[in-house]
Amino acid sequence: MQSQVRQNFHSDCEAAINRMVNMEMYASYVYLSMSYYFDRDDVALHHVAKFFKEQSHEEREHAEKFLKYQNKRGGRVVLQDIKKPERDEWGNTLEATQAALQLEKTVNQALLDLHKLASDKVDAHLCDFLESEYLEEQVKAMKQLGDYITNLKRLGVPQNGMGEYLFDKHTLGESS
């Protein structure tokens, strides 16, 4: 049945939003995997684990925001299978943070592609939604991860295990 509230909401945008929901859920799943990897007794970087768990929750919230938006515009939610993360072992904090930055760049590009699609379909509402709810936050997340990578390298990670411990305790421990 067709929605009675649907207006100027192209089916291509609707389908792309469903794909974004899947991508955000995948990102949440990856961060959850990272979180519980760093929480293991043989890794034991609890602030790193907490940071990645918070990222997982944030990505899930992003997915839910898209789901709510889809309904608000009269679109139909079509959920897809969520792919398993590429890895189960995340190595050291530097490796995981580099993987997280790559993930955020992938999500950011998908958001930019969705914004272009919305712009091409003259969907000002979707453009505004993306600009106000997602794009700035993505840039901030990428900057934060980039800063963390710089500081981890400065501390000598991965060669220096003490550097990883200090990053966990002082950088992420302070933000708790």
Swiss-Prot record:
CDD domains in UniProt: Euk_Ferritin
Keywords: Cytoplasm, Iron, Iron storage, Metal-binding, Oxidoreductase
All copies of domain Ferritin-like diiron, residue ranges: 7-156
InterPro entries, per database record: Ferritin (IPR001519), Ferritin-like (IPR012347), Ferritin-like_diiron (IPR009040), Ferritin-like_SF (IPR009078), Ferritin_CS (IPR014034), Ferritin_DPS_dom (IPR008331)
Binding site for Fe cation 1: E24, E59, H62
First-tier enzyme category under EC: oxidoreductase
Keyword Cytoplasm attached: yes
GO cellular component terms attached to this protein's record: cytoplasm
SUPFAM superfamilies for this protein: Ferritin-like
One GO molecular-function entry: ferroxidase activity
Xref: Pfam families: Ferritin
Function, as annotated: Stores iron in a soluble, non-toxic, readily available form. Important for iron homeostasis. Has ferroxidase activity. Iron is taken up in the ferrous form and deposited as ferric hydroxides after oxidation.
Miscellaneous remark of the record: There are three types of ferritin subunits in amphibia: L, M and H chains. M and H chains are fast mineralizing; the L chain is very slow mineralizing.
Protein name in UniProt: Ferritin heavy chain A
Natural source organism: Xenopus laevis (African clawed frog)
The encoding gene: fth1-a
